[in-house]
């Protein structure tokens, strides 16, 4: 990918692409049926996005992902956070 592309994303979102790449790398072999793993991912994404995730919403996201109803990706978590 073009380095300027990443710089534009960083500028618009405030999220460093290195942080995104590090998170993506840590997810490759993660067990998404494990509640603690999913909570950790939610907290990392929330921290990167500078968003607070209320406990009730976190519980809903965890239940959706660990039950297999939802796939774990930034889009899914972002959508759930926006629908609070």
Swiss-Prot record:
GO cellular component, one term: cytoplasm
Record flagged with keyword Cytoplasm: yes
UniProtKB keywords: Cytoplasm, Sporulation, Transcription, Transcription regulation
Induction annotation: Transcribed by the SigK RNA polymerase beginning 4 hours after the onset of sporulation.
Keyword Cytoplasm belongs to the record: yes
Pfam families noted in UniProt: SpoVIF
Role summary: Transcription factor involved in spore coat assembly and spore resistance. Required for gene regulation during the latter stages of sporulation. Regulates the transcription of at least cgeA, cotG and cotS. May directly or indirectly control the function of the GerE protein.
Name of protein: Sporulation-specific transcription factor SpoVIF
Species annotation: Bacillus subtilis (strain 168)
């Amino acid at each position: 990918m073009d380095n300027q592309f990443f710089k534009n994303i960083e500028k618009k979102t405030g999220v460093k692409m290195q942080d995104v790449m590090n998170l993506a790398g840590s997810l490759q072999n993660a067990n998404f049926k494990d509640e603690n793993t999913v909570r950790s991912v939610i907290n990392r994404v929330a921290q990167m996005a500078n968003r607070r995730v209320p406990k009730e919403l976190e519980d809903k996201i965890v239940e959706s992902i660990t039950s297999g109803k939802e796939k774990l990706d930034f889009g899914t978590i972002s959508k759930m956070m926006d629908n609070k």
